[in-house]
Amino acid sequence: MDSAREVSDGRLTVEGFSVASRAFADKWKIHNQSFPPWSWVPLINRTLLVSKKEEGYLSLEKIIILSSLEEEIPEDESLNVATDCLEKEETVDHTILVPTMENEAHYYDFHIVYSASYKVPVLYFRGYCSGGEPLALDVIKKDVPSCSVSLLLESKWTFITQEEHPYLNRPWFKLHPCGTEDWIKLLSQSSSSSGCQMPIVLYLVSWFSVVGQVVGLRIPLEMLN
């Protein structure tokens, strides 16, 4: 398991990411029950060079946004206010979700993936219509709260790019991780100055409390305890 140093320098190892991911998913399931749980997707048989350490990523999928509700949603609400989550997607008949022109449903998938080059988590996401057509970034920005768009425009630590998903080989959007190590390091040092180190189990929770806001996903404060 990672040492306190690996948290204080803002980076994670593969094992640390696995530990932090499971802790994040457990806390989310307990404190954010208006959403379906994040699931751990294991990576198997990738290449002969893969180490014996467990690898995988977190997945939260089929979050539904009804775009006609956008004007009615207060800015301090996250995506779950306009969302009916598919908690048991295998039992849901998607044909009943086909919207009218006035009530268009948009679906969102979110993946938290480990970046081996930056040694930090990266948020990948995509939006699509009920028919499967992908949403352009301009449309996605209209779906998320305006405060999320403002946060992205003012951000000095990230920006949105579109590139191939590292495991699905399809184009997804992602929040670039170029500044993640630095601000996580500052956050860790702040915790350290108060007499405590940021434990590995809170790494992803702390990270997502910032990153999630960019895409309109906020976490309950209880998850930070």
Swiss-Prot record:
Q: Which GO terms describe its cellular component?
A: membrane
According to the UniProt entry, what is the EC number of this protein? 2.3.2.-
Presence of the UniProt keyword Membrane in the record: yes
One of the Pfam families matching this protein, by short name: Autophagy_act_C
Q: Which GO terms describe its biological process?
A: autophagy; cellular pigment accumulation; cellular response to nitrogen starvation; defense response to bacterium; defense response to fungus; positive regulation of autophagosome assembly; response to carbon starvation
Residue stretches spanning the membrane: 200-217
Q: Which InterPro entries match?
A: Atg3/Atg10
State the active site: 178 (glycyl thioester intermediate)
Q: Which GO terms describe its molecular function?
A: ubiquitin activating enzyme activity; ubiquitin-like protein transferase activity
**Where does this one sit in the cell?**
Membrane
Q: Establish whether keyword Transferase is in the entry.
A: yes
Q: What induces it?
A: Slightly induced upon B.cinerea infection.
Q: What happens when the gene is disrupted?
A: Mutant atg10-1 cannot form the ATG12-ATG5 conjugate and fails to accumulate autophagic bodies inside the vacuole. Plants are hypersensitive to nitrogen and carbon starvation and initiate senescence and programmed cell death (PCD) more quickly. Reduced anthocyanin levels under anthocyanin-inductive conditions. Development of spreading necrosis upon infection with the necrotrophic fungal pathogen, A.brassicicola, which is accompanied by the production of reactive oxygen intermediates and by enhanced hyphal growth. By contrast, in response to the virulent biotrophic phytopathogen, P.syringae pv.
Q: How does it sit in the membrane?
A: Single-pass membrane protein
The alphabetized UniProt keywords are: Autophagy, Membrane, Plant defense, Transferase, Transmembrane, Transmembrane helix, Ubl conjugation pathway
Principal location class: membrane
The family classification in the record reads: Belongs to the ATG10 family.
Q: Give the protein's function.
A: E2-like enzyme involved in autophagy. Acts as an E2-like enzyme that catalyzes the conjugation of ATG12 to ATG5. The ATG12-ATG5 conjugates is required for the formation of autophagic vesicles and for the timely progression of senescence and programmed cell death (PCD). Likely serves as an ATG5-recognition molecule. Confers some resistance to nitrogen and carbon starvation. Is also involved in the formation of anthocyanic vacuolar inclusions (AVI).
By what name is this protein known? Ubiquitin-like-conjugating enzyme ATG10
Recorded source organism is Arabidopsis thaliana (Mouse-ear cress)
Q: What is the lineage of its organism?
A: Eukaryota, Viridiplantae, Streptophyta, Embryophyta, Tracheophyta
Q: What's the name of its gene?
A: ATG10
